[in-house]
């Protein structure tokens, strides 16, 4: 009996509704400026790896130790991903199987803590992450969570306060990492505090892993017991997670925490795409992109602290940035975070509203916006383009701005930097 006709038919014939969604989304990405700090554009080679026949293969276990036959080629793919991750970050151990950053984080905690243990991380409302102890998240339900925050005047993490919190709570795990904090973390100070209270130090570098890979951001690997990350964001790989460590003694616990602790079969097509992304991240081209990413964020921060923005009630948390994102503070502005997000969307710039520390507004409204530059650097933007983008954003955040004229300026930029040329879906 021949294969069903639908087996070899193109998506446009089998499922025109989904084909239309893909085409529309491609058009949206091409015709707008993507500035959500947790998003990026993956290289075409990563798309090709992920959209491959490896999606067909079940491979529970690890290379050379599978519970299924026929794994000789997916073993090669996973070992490449492991070796490349270790080389890229200078780690002794890597697990590339986590389906996401959240599952990687769940596995880390399962490996280095017991349910009911005390964990200490950055307060969610001050830039932390759900998986660092938020009460409605697994991390706040399974573990006893405490938090440190930022200084109310500088909005910086005060390591003396972190030490005081650690001495008061005596956590088994101290978490260094963030989802909305624009400065470097002092990994050496975190290490010292962890040692003082006998805690494990876990660094979640999901947002800045690409910067670390490029050597333009301090690496947490020499200081942390365990490092976790997503592979998208600044790394520009597939949406997924990775766990790293310099301590090979933790290898068995970490591997067991991922499989069978958190997951069953790994997604081999995604793991292959991770391997491709790690290879690209080791290139000078990638390093240049990360340098432009930081340059773009700093240009934006400088523009938003200029006199006209200040007069419009806009400021920048911490006064600038060391990384790929800027946090615009709108507490003194006539517009709130939701209104700013909507106005920027109208001109063709995609960002997300974001709470600022000590925010008087609710989380669905907020008094800030988080703006990232990774995707634009990937698209090829440099100093000239980022200067124009910064000016467009500054103008958009003013009351009564001409949004139609600003939209035209955005289209000039997108037209000059085509995305995924030749791709139709």
UniProtKB/Swiss-Prot annotation:
InterPro entries: PyrdxlP-dep_Trfase, PyrdxlP-dep_Trfase_major, PyrdxlP-dep_Trfase_small, Ser_HO-MeTrfase, Ser_HO-MeTrfase-like, Ser_HO-MeTrfase_PLP_BS, SHMT-like_dom. It comes from the Bacteria. Pathway: One-carbon metabolism; tetrahydrofolate interconversion; Amino-acid biosynthesis; glycine biosynthesis; glycine from L-serine: step 1/1. SUPFAM superfamilies: PLP-dependent transferases (SSF53383). CDD domains: SHMT (cd00378). This is Serine hydroxymethyltransferase. The keyword tRNA processing does not apply. Catalyzes the reversible interconversion of serine and glycine with tetrahydrofolate (THF) serving as the one-carbon carrier. This reaction serves as the major source of one-carbon groups required for the biosynthesis of purines, thymidylate, methionine, and other important biomolecules. Also exhibits THF-independent aldolase activity toward beta-hydroxyamino acids, producing glycine and aldehydes, via a retro-aldol mechanism. (6S)-5,6,7,8-tetrahydrofolate binds at residues 124, 128-130. It catalyses: (6R)-5,10-methylene-5,6,7,8-tetrahydrofolate + glycine + H2O = (6S)-5,6,7,8-tetrahydrofolate + L-serine. The modification N6-(pyridoxal phosphate)lysine is found at residue 233. The record marks 232 as: Plays an important role in substrate specificity. Homodimer. Keywords: Amino-acid biosynthesis, Cytoplasm, One-carbon metabolism, Pyridoxal phosphate, Transferase. Its EC number is 2.1.2.1. GO terms for cellular component: cytosol. GO terms for biological process: glycine biosynthetic process from serine; tetrahydrofolate interconversion. Belongs to the SHMT family. Gene3D superfamilies: Aspartate Aminotransferase, domain 1 (3.90.1150.10), Type I PLP-dependent aspartate aminotransferase-like (Major domain) (3.40.640.10). Its cofactor is pyridoxal 5'-phosphate. GO terms for molecular function: glycine hydroxymethyltransferase activity; pyridoxal phosphate binding. Transmembrane segments: none annotated. It is found in: Cytoplasm. The keyword Cytoplasm applies. PROSITE patterns: SHMT. Pfam families: SHMT (PF00464).
